[in-house]
Design a protein with these regions (language model features):
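Catalytic phosphate/metal-binding cores of nucleic-acid and nucleotide-processing enzymes, i.e., regions
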Residues: 38, 106-111, 117, 147-150
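A short hydrophobic beta-strand segment most commonly corresponding to one strand
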Residues: 89-92, 116-118, 132-150
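Short beta-strand His + acidic residue motifs that chelate non-heme Fe in jelly-roll/DSBH
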Residues: 79-81, 99-101, 119-132
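A short glycine-rich, His/Asp/Glu-containing loop-to-beta-strand
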Residues: 55-75
Length: 151
């Protein structure tokens, strides 16, 4: 089958780039905008909570996250091998033993459900969901650009 146009993941923004919440609300609406000149500043502008969700918002505030998203990866899928502008915090909400991340050192990691993980996504990485029917669901937030190590 032809998989070139298959969407392997969906993301929903948990933060807006506008205090009145009228800016871009879903990162998916802005695919391609986080590239090139000004991309870092654009990505860092997503700091305003979109939902009255005290537990999620306290998680965001604790780590000083921006552009935090709920990310869903489909079964039997792999993301492109890429690198990002900033380091990330991952909180796996629903995962399975057939999900893993391949990080810059080419080592595969299984991120366990309910644990918090620092990932240096400024280095090349990808994610796999090899399960036949279970999706992978993570909350992923970008750390401040001046973050150098896990604090």
């Amino acid at each position: 089958s032809d998989t070139k146009n298959t969407i392997n993941w969906t993301q929903f923004s948990l933060q807006s780039n506008s205090p009145d919440k009228k800016g871009i609300k879903y990162s998916q609406d802005a695919v391609g905008k986080a590239k090139g000149k000004g991309a870092e500043e654009w990505e860092c502008s997503f700091v305003y909570p979109l939902f009255d969700a005290p537990i999620i918002n306290s998680f965001i505030n604790h780590f000083k996250l921006h552009r935090t998203r709920l990310m869903i990866q489909e079964p039997r899928s792999v993301l492109t091998y890429h690198k990002d502008w900033s380091q990330r915090i991952h909180l796996p909400i629903d995962t399975n033993e057939d999900c893993m991340m391949l990080l810059g050192n080419m080592q595969a990691y299984h991120l366990e459900q309910g644990k918090i993980y620092y990932t240096d996504t400024t280095k090349r990485h990808t994610a796999f969901n090899c399960h036949n029917f279970i999706r992978r669901l993570h909350i992923v937030g970008c750390l401040p650009l001046n973050t150098r190590t896990w604090e």
